[in-house]
Curated annotation (Swiss-Prot):
Expressed by the venom gland. This is Helofensin-1. Belongs to the beta-defensin family. Helofensin subfamily. Lethal toxin which possesses an inhibitory effect on direct electrical stimulation of the isolated hemi-diaphragm. Neither hemorrhagic nor hemolytic activities are detected. Phospholipase A2 activity, proteolytic activity and arginine esterolytic activity are absent. The keyword Metal-binding does not apply. It is found in: Secreted. GO terms for cellular component: extracellular region. Keywords: Neurotoxin, Secreted, Toxin. The keyword Cell wall biogenesis/degradation does not apply. One of its GO terms (molecular function) is toxin activity. Its main location: secreted. One of its GO terms (biological process) is defense response.
């Protein structure tokens, strides 16, 4: 799973336990951010 920091490093946001960089789900996040 991606951490919130890893997701943000990819210019993504954590929603619904998934990382969404540019609106593409690439992996689960560790928590709802």
């Amino acid at each position: 799973a991606y951490t919130t920091e890893q997701c943000r490093a990819l210019n993504g946001t954590c929603r619904f336990y998934a990382c969404f960089p540019k609106n593409v789900v690439i992996g689960k996040c560790d928590w709802l951010g």
